[in-house]
């Protein structure tokens, strides 16, 4: 969720201005104690009202959009945001129609299978333990004991943004994002990177 992306961006020392929906979405996960495997997830959510405010003024280094397609950002608004912002844009969205140009799109295997247009020049596909694929090249994931994949995509998105802003190349940002996601899945529940984690990832 957007709050998890926000929290991980803060862990990397990035100043963040966040706009999100005011409605609470509660996710309850039922996990088997012995195997630590999720058995069931129950979501309780109210209708989410579309965003109708103004974008904040100021100079921003990047625009990060975490969109679970609950209704806060319409498809039209998503395209308008990409056209409006003059700088690097990073999108993680469950929509099936996404901007083709001027943004890095991070999606997983399932989301990729649902895309209406798959020939995207800046598509980054996360493939779980296998890592991430970009322009036909697979960037291998870290070998770790996986306890919980919840929130790993959020961690990846935040780290990808930080890596790009730091190194200036998405090819260098992806390995850092893989390392960050590996830390997240090594813990149970939605995990936010600590300062110690970030120092280890950057070393």
Regions found by a protein language model. Give the residues of each.
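Glycine-rich phosphate-binding loops at beta-strand->alpha-helix junctions
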Residues: 68-73
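A short beta-strand/loop micro-motif in the catalytic core of glycosyltransferases
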Residues: 103-109
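A structural micro-motif
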Residues: 14, 37, 87-88, 103, ...
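Conserved phosphate-binding/catalytic region of the ribokinase-like
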Residues: 46, 59, 76-88, 93-99, ...
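Conserved N-terminal subdomain of the carbohydrate kinase-like
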Residues: 1-65, 191-203
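A generic structural signal for well-ordered coil/turn residues at beta-strand boundaries
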Residues: 24-25, 36-38, 101, 119, ...
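Short, ordered loop/turn segments at secondary-structure junctions
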Residues: 21, 94-95, 110
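Structural motif
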Residues: 41, 62-66, 90, 106, ...
